[in-house]
Amino acid sequence: MIFLFVLSSCSTDGNHPDFEANVEKVQTFLELQGSEADPQAQLDMIHEDLEWQPAFYGTGLIGKAEFGEYLIGWQDAMEDVVYTATNYLPGVNPETGILDGSVRSYGTWTGVHSETGKSWELSSYHTWDFKDGQIVYGGDYFDAGGFLASLAPSEEE
């Protein structure tokens, strides 16, 4: 009997209490990225202490101002962008292994390259950590260099 009590007290009740709300914030953030409707609304979701890992090789962490430029750069280069999530996964604190409300997602971006008109599809992985209800840390993980090279005008064009 004591064993069952100890075993049940060690189990979790599911996700961190902030996880579902944070997933909704991430979904809104991604929809804004694709629609290009309101870059400021995206930046309002970002904490002043942001540290973001861009997808480009050799790039270190960037802060909020650089992140705004990074987002607008993608928006200027692409049209009709949609992110289709394969999943939204709960993240854990790397030091404790305990669910912390952060969000991870594998998914696929689709869209059209503004300059060449080429349609594209890109598999990716993203992370978002939160502080005070805002995104404070995260990153984009995909082959940005290879992706952009695939969109370059061909010799025939």
Provide a role label for each language-model segment.
Residues 1-2:
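Sec-dependent signal peptide recognition
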Residues 5-9:
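C-terminal motif of bacterial Sec signal peptides marking the signal peptidase cleavage site
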Residues 10-157:
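C-terminal and inter-domain tail/linker signature
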